Amino acid sequence: MFAAKQLTLGAIAGAIFISSSFAARAGNGGYGGDEGYGKKTNINLAVASNFYGVPPSNSAITDLINSFEAANPKYTVTVVDNGATATLASHIINGNLLKVDLFLAADTATPQDLLINHFNLVAPYNSSHTPPLYTFNYAQGVLALLSNTPGVDLSCDTSGTCGYDPKVYSTVAIADPSLAPYGVAAQSVLIGRYDLMPPLSSNPLVHEYPNITAAYDAVIAKTDPVGFVTMSAICSNGSYPTSGTSALAYFSIESSSIPSVLINNYNPLTQAGIAIRNRRTPAQNTELDAFVAFLTDFTSPPTPDSPMMTTLKKYCYSAP
């Protein structure tokens, strides 16, 4: 079990030493600015684990940064922090030592909490707009159940039970609900649909991990036979494993066997961002505004998909 712990300032300071690895994994440039000839303007991101993925080949944010930088050669975007949403928020609240400019969370509640309870830490992302704009929605995700046994049909077993079955699987991996919105969604499914007794942190059937990527890794490593993960982790060019394979999508609302009766699995996983107060040059503020506009361009057919819509579809997200 992983207990939910707030990081100390010392731990956050230690994270500065490894922050360059986040940027390297995201495949982006350094900490440029608009000062000096030939230097590029840069902004720093903190990104929730599900949207960070596993760069460079399976990462929604890396794809988006590459598209944005290709269209804007004077700009760079660097991921300096990634992890569970609550962990990233804690880093920002406790000094923002990684100098984050934009926080992309896996929920709407955390950016809203920063806006209401830590207003001195946030900034409008479009200063010319009246009234000022602070938070914005950029994606909606989906929860999925994943097995580490190829060929396992999670849609229905021989007894007719579909999806997760506490009588069949010794343990199930989830992200820590106190830290990760996808963990909250998994908790809602396990308690509300499968009648597991709370608190899940002390339930021997449940293994909690510090973020959704760690839960996915636990299933792949066969630490747990199944786990609730983000759909984006198992999505390939807009398609996810279908019935008869080792994964099953859990949408927030599903049809049931009873006509006109819906199953409410969890609250929709709408993901929001918020600009963080930092010492930025006018050029960096302009870049920040441009990047938010890029992330919120949901243009789709009949006109060609925007880069944002192309990326959302590729990783099985939808527009919020």
Which functions belong to the PLM regions below?
Residues F22-R25:
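Sec/Tat signal peptide C-region and signal peptidase I cleavage site
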Residues N126-S128:
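Serine-hydrolase catalytic machinery in alpha/beta-hydrolase-like enzymes
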Residues G27-N94, A105-V122, P131-P320:
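Exported/periplasmic ABC-transporter solute-binding proteins
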Residues L102:
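Mobile, glycine-rich extracellular loop/lid and propeptide segments
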Residues G10-S20:
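Bacterial N-terminal signal peptides
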Residues M1-A11:
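Bacterial N-terminal signal peptides that target proteins for export
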